[in-house]
Amino acid sequence: DMSVCAVLLGCSSDDAKFSDGKKALDGAFGSFEIYTPEIPDEVYEKIRVNGGEEMETAVATENTDPVIIPKGSYPSVECEFTKAENIDAPVSKGQALGKINFTLDGEKIIEGSIVSETAVEKIGFVFALKKVLLNLLNI
């Protein structure tokens, strides 16, 4: 739902105030719409973690909230993103791994981030030893 607020000053009568207010609100609702970003599936592909206790980390997006755009311009919105193919451990939750931008007629309307959804610790000696022992026991 889109909310619009109109402030009218200096109206000559209550009838004029309501008439002008209705025109202003009709104009706003008739001229604009809410655009909710459609994030491509490729953005959510996991990223490989080098030297981590986990092989990969899931990703999420931040700052990709809906925005108001001129009505009918939805098909002209373009999405561009860049993200790391792999990253070295440690990785903290919320760590920036890329950017995602939405543009309308060349003007940036949304500038978001691609971030790690989980933390991945750097592999240590104890973890590596435990992993080796577990693999030996599974033979």
Predicted regions and their residues:
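Domain-terminus/edge residues, biased toward the C-terminal soluble/receptor-binding domains
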Residues: 1-139
